[in-house]
Amino acid sequence: MNSLVTFILPVYNAESTIYRCLDSILKQTYCDYEVIIVDDGSIDNSGKICDSYSLRDNRFRVVHTENAGVASARQLGVSLATGEYVIHIDSDDWIESNMLSDMMNEISDADILVSDYYYNTKHGQTYVRQVDCTTSEELLDKIIKGEVFGSLWHKLIRRNLYQNIEFNTDLTFCEDQLLLFKILTTYQCKVINLHKAYYHYECNDGSITQRTDREYFDNKIKYEDYALRVLSPLSFRYIRDIFVLDRLKSYSGPIQSKIYSNSEIKALVNRLPKPNVSMIRLKFVFVNQILFFIQILKAPVVIKKILVKVFRIIKVL
């Protein structure tokens, strides 16, 4: 008997894309799956569309809730899942018909399978290859370095890894990456890669990750604070230090757009722990130095002083 796989699908006002998403699940050649659809208070026809699929196929289950955000929707989906494995899918994305079949043929005794994926924009489609990993620490390291994407949607994960681990429901994005950090710092997982792409990640101009307003950066900072706590144990200090350096360079957005006041930017910098750069690869630090020089050249005088202080933190001694 084949193992059951659970799809978790949060939906909010997705009537323009949900048909394509649900049809791609329906076309899976691997038939032993269930779909937990959490309609997060949609005010368009998304909920009705999802209901129509549940009437057609009893593997589709729809739960309608008041709007509480994507993290709450994912958490509810996980709590209702009964499959041995779990994979997430977003309502504006879609998957190839052989995805589950190939993944289930490969996963064997592994805990997490990471596949490649397609990055789709209005300009075309790009194949994105993920770096090989075999352990929790390797996967965590590669995600923070940007060599593996941190989302859950191209990762098949054993459901028991979700036990006693919850999404941070006050996050509006990066909730899946933070959840993955928690799994990888809690369990010693066997990880394998499947170098085929099945998931089509649709990047559109209206997505929350394309925003640059204060709400976006506030959420990003909140995520960073949570992530630093997850990475605080001594055994993950090296990875945490890389995360700190990467976060420092990400402050270019609020600096250039003047979303935060000078005092707020200074507070952002000061709240980060000082990384031990002697443990970090010279190449990684050098890239961050170059990015800071660019920021310093463009920034106002007051911000220059703050950035120079930051640069001294990451300077190779």
Q: Can you say where each PLM-predicted feature lies in the sequence?
A:
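Short, acidic, metal-binding catalytic loop of nucleotide-sugar glycosyltransferases
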Residues: 23-32
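N-proximal low-complexity "stem/linker" segments adjacent to membrane-targeting elements
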Residues: 1-24
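Short aromatic/hydrophobic "clamp" motif used to bind/position activated sugar donors
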Residues: 86
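Glycine-rich, basic loop-to-helix element that forms the pyrophosphate-binding segment
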Residues: 65-81
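Conserved donor NDP-sugar-binding/catalytic core segment of glycosyltransferases
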Residues: 98-127
